[in-house]
Amino acid sequence: MLFVCLLVTTAGAQPVCLNLQTARTSAHYSIAVGERLSLVFPHSIYGSRVEEQFRVTPKGFQLLELRYAEPRLVEFYGHESAANEDGAWVVRQRAPVLTVLDLLVSPDSRTDVIFGTEKLTVKHDSLFEGRARLTVSACPRSDHG
């Protein structure tokens, strides 16, 4: 099952479209360049919370920081250091812009895509087997899904 919401960008911000595609559906949501987008999901082995924070660019997504609920996840992913901030282990890094974020959600799991005050929830579903793809593009004339 897939739940989606529309975000209206603030005045003056350059809008682009966040495109969400599954095997059966495609939807477009207005989002501002420079806005943060987070992916939040349980770790596939340990089950604890992982949050990946990106900055939206005209061409995609730039990773800004990773937030882990447990220090063993920092070690699991091979990061040399992390700071404990407000109960999360935070790794900050600037990475090249990714043009695509491919999401794979296992059964009985979910990934939340959060931007602004909105949240899209991707769950495993037999229709699209838990696969979804996020991209950024110029918005078509009608930016509704």
Annotate each language-model stretch with its function.
Residues 3, 29, 41, 54, ...:
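Phenylalanine-focused residue identity feature
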Residues 14-70:
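N-terminal secretory signal peptides
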Residues 71-145:
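Mature, soluble, non-transmembrane domains
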Residues 1-8:
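Bacterial N-terminal signal peptides
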Residues 6, 16-18, 138-140:
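Sequence contexts marking disulfide-bonded cysteines in secreted/extracellular proteins
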